[in-house]
Structures are given as structure tokens and as C-alpha cells.
A protein has these predicted regions:
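Active-site/ligand-binding-proximal alpha/beta "capping" segment
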Residues: 210, 230-248
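GTPase G-domain guanine-specificity segment
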Residues: 201, 233-235, 239, 251-260, ...
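Conserved ATPase-coupling elements of RecA-like P-loop NTPase cores
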Residues: 145-146, 197-203, 230-232, 257
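Inter-motif core of Ras-like GTPase G domains
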Residues: 203-224
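Primarily NTPase-proximal linker/entry elements flanking Walker-type ATP/GTP-binding cores
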Residues: 5-138, 145-192
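Short, ordered loop/turn segments at secondary-structure junctions
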Residues: 138-141, 164-168, 192-195, 223-226, ...
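Single conserved hydrophobic/aromatic residue that forms the stacking wall/gate
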Residues: 261-277
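Conserved beta-strand/loop subsegment of P-loop NTPase cores
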Residues: 134, 188-190, 215-222, 241-252, ...
Length: 277
């Protein structure tokens, strides 16, 4: 993913003149090509525009360090700004998993990787933090969704809530809460159902589960190949449900995996952290 963007950016700065300070024309020439490279990588126009403006403001008029050329100076500024867009200035806060049992609600569209991510997250809590974790599938719509989580749980040695046919998502959430308390679990993860697109039924169901579980964290799982629509998905879920974090999956895909650039700055402005799986 990032290798493809790197290839697009290679050679962008060849035309910069060798002078002591960077003029606006020098910067504009290089950044015009950077913007094209971002747009070709499916980065949205608004995000590319904000990125270029931030770089231009920092680059124009800067005195070039003696040991580097103006082109190298601009490359460094672009690099630093790209790092900021992806990571921000501060380290992301740790997930709130104190005061057990701590509920974590997993939401997102169908096919984004919620179930697999739930298992990865549970395994991380178990292996790195020594936590006792319970997973529960609330997806009563997708065939074999509950069985999938059950299989993943057995593979990583994490307990899953026993399947009771005919239960609705709210009943499952309540049973998971009770089981987590009685079983001495540190964390319980609720894997909700997804849809191919955001609709009122999906949002209403997730909101109802949220009200029952009162989760410490509500994590939105987004497919890294979503591209420009990633921001719309994150905004919709945050407005209707309240999202505390975003998990991006399949980040080893093609150029559209640059959803990370799309989503990092808008979500950071909303106070939402994100992680990559």
C-alpha cells in the first residue's frame, strides 16, 4: 500500500532549483505533483488539499540546511506532515479495560473484519495483558457468524458465550454481561452484526446493545480497502452510536488501503483514536 504511494512520489522533487531558500513557485511545482500522487492513490480531494496546504505553509520561506538541497528539505517536510496525518502528535490512549468486567462493543459494516478483529483483540489482551476474556457473537443474521467466533475462540484459547438459538442480540448482550460477571472475566467483547451498507436497522440495533452493555470502548472496524468512503462510515457511526476508536483492517492491500490517510485526520478532530490490524 504505502510502497505504491512511495513509487508515485519518487522523482516528484527533481525540478526544485538549488537555492538557499524555497520560493512559493518551487514549493507549488513539487506539491502539485504530490497532490496528483495522492489523488491517484484514491485519497479524497479534501484530504489531499488539507495535506498540501499544511506542507506549503511549513515549506515556504524556510531556510535550507547547509547539508541538504531544497528538494531534500521539502521531502522531509512532506514526510513529517504525512507522519503527523497518520499518527498525530501524541501516542493514542490505551483502551479502557479497568474495573472488570470491561465491555467492548465491536461495530462496523459487513465484511469489514469485525469477527476476526474481535478474536485478534481478545488474543492480544490474553497474551500481552494476561486478561481473562469472553467473546460473544450478537450476529443472528449472517449464517454461521456465531460458529465462526466460536471456532476462532477455540483456536486462540479464549472463551466464547455458548450459542442459544433463537435469542435476539439484546438477550445475548445481557447474558454475556451476566456470564462475564459471574465467571470472573476481565473483559468481554460483543461482536455485533453488520450490513452491506449503513441503515436504520443496523444503527438502531447497535445503539440498543450499547445502551444495555454500557461499553467502555466502542470500536468501529473499517475495511482498509474502503477508500474515500471510510470517513463517511466513521462519521455516521460516531454520530449515531458514539465511537471511541477505529480499527483499520486489510492495510496490506492496494492503493485504496490509504483509508488510513482519509480517516486519521477527521477522526482525530473528533477525539477518536485508531489502530491498524
Amino acid at each position: 500500500m504505502f510502497e505504491s504511494l512511495s513509487e508515485r512520489l519518487s522523482g516528484v522533487f527533481d525540478r526544485l532549483t538549488k537555492q538557499g531558500a524555497l520560493s512559493e513557485d518551487d514549493v507549488k511545482t513539487a506539491l502539485r505533483e504530490v497532490r496528483v500522487a495522492l489523488l491517484e492513490a484514491d485519497v479524497s480531494l479534501s484530504v489531499a488539499r488539507d495535506f498540501i496546504k499544511a506542507v506549503q505553509d511549513k515549506a515556504t520561506g524556510q531556510t535550507v540546511t547547509k547539508s541538504v538541497t531544497p528538494g531534500q528539505q521539502v521531502v522531509k517536510i512532506v514526510h513529517d506532515e504525512l507522519v503527523y496525518f497518520l499518527a498525530g502528535e501524541e501516542d493514542p490512549e490505551k483502551l479502557k479495560i479497568d474495573n472488570p468486567p470491561a465491555p467492548i462493543l465491536m461495530v462496523g459494516l459487513q465484511g469489514s473484519g469485525k469477527t476476526t478483529t474481535s478474536a485478534k483483540l481478545a488474543n492480544r489482551f490474553k497474551q500481552k495483558d494476561g486478561k481473562k476474556v469472553l467473546m460473544a457473537s450478537l450476529d443472528v443474521n449472517r449464517p454461521a457468524a456465531m460458529e465462526q467466533l466460536q471456532i476462532l475462540g477455540s483456536q486462540i484459547g479464549v472463551d466464547t458465550l455458548p450459542i442459544v438459538k433463537g435469542e435476539d442480540p439484546l438477550a445475548i448482550a445481557k447474558r454475556a454481561k451476566t456470564q462475564a460477571s459471574l465467571g470472573g472475566y476481565d473483559i468481554y467483547i460483543l461482536d455485533t452484526a453488520g450490513r452491506l451498507h449503513i441503515d436504520q436497522e443496523l444503527i438502531a440495533q447497535a445503539a440498543a446493545v450499547r445502551d444495555v452493555a454500557n461499553p467502555r470502548e466502542t470500536l468501529l472496524v473499517v475495511d482498509g480497502l474502503t477508500g474515500q468512503d471510510a470517513v463517511n462510515v466513521a462519521t455516521e457511526f460516531d454520530d449515531k452510536i458514539g465511537v471511541t476508536g477505529v480499527v483499520l483492517t486489510r492495510m496490506d492491500g492496494d492503493g485504496r488501503g490509504l483509508s488510513l490517510i482519509h480517516i486519521s485526520e477527521p477522526t482525530r478532530r473528533r477525539g477518536i483514536s485508531y489502530a491498524v490490524f
